[in-house]
């Protein structure tokens, strides 16, 4: 493995492929702010020496020094096959280093913003109001000083003592990021709580981490008050939102269920404004983190048992930032402009934390939804007009359905749109890059594409990142043409600080997660009991190692030893395939398989992934097989906007049905359900007949966190789902196969 401090700038200085980039940087002192800013303007690395060269071989196999049977070769990015990169530069080895760089270089740029509410009318203003990087830097240091002062006074410790964990419980908002930056400035570790992680889980995390402080949104007040008696170590409760003097007095004197914690420390409510004021009048010098400082403990629920706390260091996040810089491109005409991103996905999950880390490193303005409701996303996108946004497949499929429904309102409009989209799709397939044709800019954009982009608030958008779940290739191809935007699908886990690979935006053959990035290496391990042989067909369990990968679970050596071997390889539990270009595709999940009555092996996650990635008519799926039966049944979430038109082709009355009526009729009308089932089965050419569903129960969102059948990242808790849906599954088997006579 590479030395932990190998920098992106070291790679550029030493690799002859980047000679032209090295020449451009020669006029600056290496590592200076001016050098780094010029470097940012010349990236990504994939442009050197030629982008087309990179596309042909994105990752390369290096020798397997251990020569172990049952493993593939080790794969590294073709950009950095000799060493793994752990930072952009040796002056930028932590997330705090990156933020402070941006605050120095672009102090007046917009940093954190939200839509203000007009208190007189109670309506939200049609604009975002931002605080600058300079202001955010000042505020986060004041908040950090205030946290240390208040907590340590209660603990009777020196004010600069930073040996504790800060817990955060809130929806996305600027105060979330301010708190995170305050922790970075004083080398404080934080952890995020979220109510959907499971009953009593927040209390479990607070007590496991021994966090003395909880910073929360006012909307979580009831939950916090309910938890107080079970919080053993919390002495400071901080509400992010404004609290009046009377509200604070009532909380501390009347509503607080207990007055002291288990250490006999008094528990007190504060507002974040008070904490900031304390820090302003009692400034404590910053305590910058080192690469080995523990940045965050990110709890991942998994599909069984208590959540595991993934320890992520500043080296992990700095490595992830370096990977992002190596692959993202900002065009020359945008480099000196104020650009924006929308913080939409939950900050309690590592995916959005990684996105925001990059945003803060490059000087983006970060906007937040005006209320924690995903249905207002498009409304706020239209106002912010972001340059980039990270979205999950469920949102993209809704975009697809909405666009198609809008285009279907007239025959002429539909025919014009189909002509344009077919032409663009052909150009993408032929070129393998963005459509730079005159026809695209003078005709296609004016007639169709600009209108679609404006309707979704994506008029300034350059790329969309997606991950966390499979996405249909048809959805990717359609949106790429309809929006003329590169969509990049990534792969990563909490343990790898989100994405370690990312597909290229305009590749001819979509569907992979791209090649391993510059901050990690990977290999495949054979899973013979599932028929995967890594050393023969490059299919097996994906293992990852490198500076972007975690080292341990918090206070959990047993789970750590199961996940990470003595050589540092983290076993992901995902079965992957590596193609001839070095790109990774996830195809299955280790250990989740069973037999049907005739002896066929069934891998339900593989089947679910194929349905979700191939069929635009569904949003969720749980595949179930009774070992005493000969066929599969399932619980399916239906995308009504996408499904309604295909069913209405034979049944015009379907167009008049509400979403609820459509779902009700699908479940009640066996003939209609059979037609829908045949439609979704025809999408899944990659499945054998015995792997396809024979009967289904549909719903709008049948797999919910509230029913405890999925994790917060929507992985199925298979045992709990089987129990929860037992009666329904039994009914489906009693009804029998709907497709026995069909050719599957």
Swiss-Prot record:
GO molecular function, one term: long-chain fatty acid-CoA ligase activity
EC number(s) reported in the record: 6.2.1.3
SUPFAM superfamilies attached to this UniProt entry: Acetyl-CoA synthetase-like
Thermoactivity: Optimum temperature is 25 degrees Celsius.
Major localisation: cytoplasm
UniProt cross-references to InterPro entries, sorted A to Z: AMP-binding_CS (IPR020845), AMP-dep_synth/lig_dom (IPR000873), ANL_N_sf (IPR042099), LC-FACS_euk (IPR045311)
Protein name: Long-chain-fatty-acid--CoA ligase 2
Organism (species): Saccharomyces cerevisiae (strain ATCC 204508 / S288c)
């Amino acid at each position: 493995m590479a030395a932990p401090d190998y920098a992106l700038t070291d790679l550029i200085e030493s690799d002859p492929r980047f000679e032209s980039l090295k020449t451009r940087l020669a006029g600056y002192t290496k590592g200076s702010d001016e050098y780094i800013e010029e470097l940012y303007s010349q990236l990504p690395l994939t442009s050197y020496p030629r982008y087309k060269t990179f596309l042909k071989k994105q990752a390369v196999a290096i020798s397997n020094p251990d020569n172990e049977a049952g493993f593939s070769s080790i794969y590294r990015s073709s950009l950095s096959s000799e060493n793994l990169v752990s930072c952009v530069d040796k002056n930028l080895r932590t997330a705090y280093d990156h933020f402070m760089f941006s605050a120095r270089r672009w102090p007046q740029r917009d940093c954190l913003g939200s839509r203000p509410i007009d208190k007189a009318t109670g309506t939200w203003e049609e604009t975002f109001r931002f605080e600058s990087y300079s202001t955010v830097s000042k505020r986060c240091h004041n908040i950090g000083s205030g946290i240390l002062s208040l907590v340590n006074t209660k603990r009777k410790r020196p004010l600069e003592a930073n040996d504790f964990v800060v817990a955060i419980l809130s929806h996305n908002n600027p105060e979330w990021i301010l708190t995170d930056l305050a922790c970075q400035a004083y080398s404080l570790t934080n952890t995020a709580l979220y109510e959907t992680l499971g009953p009593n889980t927040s209390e479990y995390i607070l007590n496991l981490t021994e966090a003395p402080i909880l910073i929360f949104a006012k909307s979580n007040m009831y939950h916090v008050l309910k938890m107080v008696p079970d919080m053993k170590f919390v002495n400071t409760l901080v509400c992010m939102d404004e609290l009046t003097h009377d509200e604070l007095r009532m909380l501390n004197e009347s509503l607080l269920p207990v007055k002291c914690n288990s250490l006999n420390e008094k528990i007190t409510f504060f507002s974040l404004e008070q904490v900031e004021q304390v820090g302003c009048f009692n400034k404590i010098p910053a305590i910058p983190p080192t690469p080995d400082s523990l940045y965050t403990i990110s709890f991942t629920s998994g599909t069984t048992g208590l959540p595991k706390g993934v320890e992520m260091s500043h080296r992990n996040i700095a490595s992830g930032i370096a990977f992002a810089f190596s692959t993202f491109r900002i065009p020359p005409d945008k480099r000196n402009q104020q650009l924006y991103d929308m913080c939409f996905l939950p900050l309690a999950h590592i995916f959005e934390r990684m996105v925001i880390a990059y945003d803060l490193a490059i000087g983006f303005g970060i906007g937040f939804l005006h209320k924690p409701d995903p249905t207002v996303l498009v409304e706020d996108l239209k106002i912010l007009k972001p340059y980039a946004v990270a979205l999950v497949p469920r949102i993209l499929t809704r975009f697809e359905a909405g666009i198609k429904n809008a285009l279907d309102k007239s025959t002429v409009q539909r025919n014009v749109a189909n002509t344009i989209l077919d032409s663009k799709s052909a150009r993408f397939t032929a070129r393998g890059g963005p459509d730079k044709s005159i026809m695209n800019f003078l005709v296609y954009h004016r007639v169709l594409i600009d209108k679609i982009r404006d309707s979704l608030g994506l008029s300034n958008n350059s790329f969309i990142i997606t991950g966390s779940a499979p996405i249909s290739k048809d959805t990717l191809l359609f949106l790429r043409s309809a929006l003329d935007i590169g969509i990049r699908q990534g792969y990563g886990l909490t343990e790898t600080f989100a994405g370690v690979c990312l597909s290229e935006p305009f590749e001819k053959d979509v569907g992979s997660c791209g090649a391993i990035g510059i901050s990690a290496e990977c290999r495949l391990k054979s899973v013979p009991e599932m028929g995967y042989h890594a050393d023969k067909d490059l299919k097996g369990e994906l293992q990852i190692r490198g500076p972007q990968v975690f080292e341990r679970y918090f206070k959990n050596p047993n789970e750590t030893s199961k996940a990470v071997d003595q050589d540092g390889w983290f076993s992901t539990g995902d079965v992957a395939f590596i193609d001839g270009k070095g790109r990774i595709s996830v195809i299955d999940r280790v250990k989740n398989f069973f037999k049907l009555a005739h002896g066929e092996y069934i891998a339900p996650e593989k089947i679910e992934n194929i349905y979700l990635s191939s069929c635009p008519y569904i949003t969720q799926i749980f595949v179930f097989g009774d070992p005493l039966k000969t066929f599969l049944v399932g619980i399916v979430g239906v995308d009504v906007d996408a499904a309604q038109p295909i069913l209405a082709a034979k049944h015009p009355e379907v167009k008049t049905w509400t979403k609820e009526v459509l779902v009700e009729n699908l479940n009640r009308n066996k003939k209609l359900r059979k037609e829908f089932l045949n439609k979704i089965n025809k999408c899944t050419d990659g499945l054998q007949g015995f792997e396809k569903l024979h009967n289904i129960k549909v719903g709008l969102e049948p797999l919910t966190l509230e029913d405890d059948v999925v994790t917060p990242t929507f992985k199925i808790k298979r045992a709990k789902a089987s129990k929860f849906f037992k009666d329904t599954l039994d009914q489906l088997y009693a009804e029998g196969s709907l497709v026995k006579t069909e050719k599957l």
